[in-house]
């Protein structure tokens, strides 16, 4: 008997080849679809990373986007000044000049009338400028770890003339510095290095965490953000819990979660610029009493990194760590390039191609 295949067998073989080809193509397509989950405690810089992806991979902000950030800049600026004024009462810090009391009243009235998103009137701008240079206000700014203050407070308040100009339009840096609490889930899509990225930013505050869970399926990698500069601060939601200790606890639960046994974990030790300034003045022992090293950036940041890496209970899992400044576009572009290379290598390994 010959070895010729019957028409049926030939058809079955063709079908099998076609299925195999489709599976391979599907596999390659799946390897090109990258789902990234941005996690981390509140105010660790996740939303700023999302804005950077828009700048780096989506051509930046349109003039319409820019206009929409104007009221946010006004509100962030005046709310920051009010936070300092209120903290002066709590910390018993008097104004350097008693005449500032009436300026403070004017600023507080704007908030009471919910007009904080409006452009500053000339009168209000002058009052804010006088308050900002007051010695008591500056003393209170120096104790910002003792109350809740936006990181961008100094950035905006140092630039009141520009923000108060009639023709003011937010710059890219202004937009990166704005702060709006993320509620729900923000999703961004972009392509880079022949890959299709879907990036999810999930609300960081404790009350938002239960909303994360349905994002967890088939995640390629997690970018976990930590604000290094928050080692001497407490949470908004619970003013007895140290922010970095909370981050460590959250990282532990994410890193060792059953959902993420196969997931690459990338750790962004963020706000390195603020940390570099703060570590000279505020001891790391506030968060880590056992720390005996120097109050210097290299040694202190390496210690923080080691604390996070020590939470990883799996010898098979590698934590990819980067020290970042989310408001610095060049830094984030460089880091994200490195992150993408890790994802590509891990993906190829998963497909048996590396």
Curated annotation (Swiss-Prot):
GO biological process, one term: adenylate cyclase-modulating G protein-coupled receptor signaling pathway
Positions of region (G2 motif): 174-182
GO cellular component terms given for this protein: cytoplasm; heterotrimeric G-protein complex
Region (G5 motif): 324-329
Domain of life: Eukaryota
Lipid attachment locations (N-myristoyl glycine): 2
Region annotated G1 motif, chain positions: 35-48
Annotated Mg(2+) binding sites: 47, 182
Binding residue positions for GTP: 40-47, 176-182, 201-205, 270-273, 326
Spans annotated as G4 motif: 266-273
Lipidation (S-palmitoyl cysteine): 3
Record SUPFAM superfamilies: P-loop containing nucleoside triphosphate hydrolases, Transducin (alpha subunit), insertion domain
Nucleotide-binding recorded as keyword: yes
Disulphide bridges, residue numbers: none
Region (G3 motif): 197-206
Keyword Lipoprotein: yes
Pfam families, alphabetized: G-alpha
Gene Ontology terms, MF aspect: G protein-coupled receptor binding; G-protein beta/gamma-subunit complex binding; GTP binding; GTPase activity; metal ion binding
Quaternary context: G proteins are composed of 3 units; alpha, beta and gamma. The alpha chain contains the guanine nucleotide binding site.
PANTHER family noted in UniProt: G PROTEIN ALPHA O SUBUNIT, GTP-BINDING PROTEIN ALPHA SUBUNIT
Family membership: Belongs to the G-alpha family. G(i/o/t/z) subfamily.
Purpose: Guanine nucleotide-binding proteins (G proteins) are involved as modulators or transducers in various transmembrane signaling systems. The G(o) protein function is not clear.
Protein name: Guanine nucleotide-binding protein G(o) subunit alpha
Organism: Planorbella trivolvis (Marsh rams-horn)
